[in-house]
A protein has these predicted regions:
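Non-transmembrane, amphipathic alpha-helical segments
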Residues: 2, 17-21, 25, 44-51, ...
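Short terminal alpha-helical segments
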Residues: 1-34, 93-100
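Generic signature of intrinsically disordered, low-complexity segments enriched in small/polar residues
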Residues: 6-8, 13, 36, 46, ...
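Amphipathic alpha-helical binding modules
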Residues: 71-108
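Generic N-terminal initiation segments characterized by hydrophobic and/or small/turn-forming residues
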Residues: 14, 37, 56-59, 65, ...
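Amphipathic alpha-helical interaction modules
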Residues: 19-68
Length: 108
């Protein structure tokens, strides 16, 4: 997995978090969750330094869907997005931005 691919996915996540939210803020957050997951799914986590490891732990916690039920098949990320507090949303946005910058600096 390349730094470039991860940087691209996190740039996409950051972009969908920006206004406007044509399908609603919750859907934008759920889409950003998905982009982050794609960016990290095959990335070797041993490559993270101390700072980025902290951001990854925060991201993992914010995106955690264990214990969430989805009886209407809306999608676990959408349900999780609805559960985020304003502080969680701010933290998520900040972490996505920091990681996108971190990946971008290393892609070359």
């Amino acid at each position: 997995m390349s730094f470039g691919y991860a940087a691209e996915k996190f740039a996409s996540a950051r972009s969908v978090l920006m206004l406007p939210h044509p399908q609603g803020e919750d859907q934008s957050i759920a889409t950003a969750f998905s982009e982050c997951r794609k960016g990290l799914e095959r990335f070797d986590r041993t490559l993270f330094d101390d700072s980025s490891s902290i951001w990854i732990k925060q991201l993992d916690q914010l995106m955690k869907t264990e214990g969430i039920e989805d009886p209407d098949r809306e999608g676990l990320f959408l349900i999780k997005a609805r559960q985020l507090s304003i502080d969680d949303q701010l933290q998520f946005s900040t972490v996505v931005d920091e990681l996108q910058c971190w990946f971008s600096r290393r892609k070359d």
